[in-house]
């Protein structure tokens, strides 16, 4: 695990984006952790978030021409990622996002930003069922562009209804690569390191770690 990945996990915990406990998911599963990127909600949060996305994108070495953020959570992510790419990596790329409802006045249309063309890097917070990716693929195809890759914050590494994760299904169905700032495995490693580094007893930390490991045995890939 790289330093920026540890920093991202600490950042997510600090901002209560990553929380531990018992959370009932839409699938009905009771998860020992919850990730809500909507809790990144200040200018400073977004600036830091963009740096993590940009660093991961540079590490992934996926060729792309444009960053696309699906409405709604993908919009600020696409914006801050492209700013960070320019500020920290001297890479200046266009970005674009869609409206949920097309405008019928003014400039009109369902897209805002640059022309949706060439090789597209789609950015979002997580992939749960892959629905947003499939909807975005329809938009990308309609404009004659191609999906080059997908970048998300957290890979849950969790099976869907079958044996594959939602991410593996996206990679299979669209022949594309999905990169993540961190995986659930990275979170486990982070917690293990924290536990080993503490002299004092950390029952809550140990309990969270044990719960996640048990959950992974049942639902992990």
Curated annotation (Swiss-Prot):
The keyword Metal-binding is annotated on this UniProt entry? no
Q: In which pathway does it act?
A: Pyrimidine metabolism; UMP biosynthesis via de novo pathway; UMP from orotate: step 1/2
Which co-factors does it depend on?
Mg(2+)
Q: Name one GO cellular component term.
A: cytoplasm
Residues involved in orotate binding: 34-35, 128, 156
Swiss-Prot/TrEMBL keywords: Glycosyltransferase, Magnesium, Pyrimidine biosynthesis, Transferase
Q: Which sites bind 5-phospho-alpha-D-ribose 1-diphosphate?
A: 26, 72-73, 99-100, 103, 105, 124-132
Spell out the coiled coil positions from the record: none
Q: What is its EC number?
A: 2.4.2.10
- Which InterPro entries does the entry mention? OPRT (IPR023031), Or_phspho_trans_dom (IPR004467), PRibTrfase_dom (IPR000836), PRTase-like (IPR029057)
**Task of the protein:** Catalyzes the transfer of a ribosyl phosphate group from 5-phosphoribose 1-diphosphate to orotate, leading to the formation of orotidine monophosphate (OMP).
**Subunit relationships:** Homodimer.
Which HAMAP family does the protein's record reference? PyrE (MF_01208)
Q: Which family does it belong to?
A: Belongs to the purine/pyrimidine phosphoribosyltransferase family. PyrE subfamily.
Q: What is this protein called?
A: Orotate phosphoribosyltransferase
Species name: Colwellia psychrerythraea (strain 34H / ATCC BAA-681) (Vibrio psychroerythus)
> What is the gene called?
pyrE
């Amino acid at each position: 695990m790289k330093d920026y990945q540890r920093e991202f996990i600490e950042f997510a915990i600090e901002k209560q984006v990553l929380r531990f406990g018992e959370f009932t998911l839409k699938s009905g599963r009771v998860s020992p952790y919850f990730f809500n990127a909507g809790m990144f909600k200040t200018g400073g949060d977004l600036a830091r978030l963009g740096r993590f996305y940009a660093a991961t994108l540079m590490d992934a070495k996926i060729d792309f021409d444009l960053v696309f953020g699906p409405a709604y959570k993908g919009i600020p992510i696409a914006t801050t990622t492209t700013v960070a790419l320019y500020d920290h990596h001297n890479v200046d790329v266009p970005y674009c996002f869609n409206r949920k409802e097309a405008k019928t006045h003014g400039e009109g249309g369902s897209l805002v930003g640059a022309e949706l063309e060439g090789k597209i890097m789609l950015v979002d917070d997580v992939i749960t069922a892959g629905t947003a990716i499939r909807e975005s693929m329809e938009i990308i195809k309609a404009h004659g562009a191609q999906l080059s890759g997908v970048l998300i914050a957290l890979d849950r590494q969790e099976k869907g209804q079958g044996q594959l994760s939602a991410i593996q299904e996206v990679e299979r169905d669209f022949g594309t690569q999905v990169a993540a700032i961190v995986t659930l495995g990275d979170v486990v490693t982070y917690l293990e390191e924290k536990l080993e580094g503490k002299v004092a007893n950390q029952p809550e930390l140990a309990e969270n770690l044990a719960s996640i490991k048990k959950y992974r045995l049942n639902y992990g890939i």
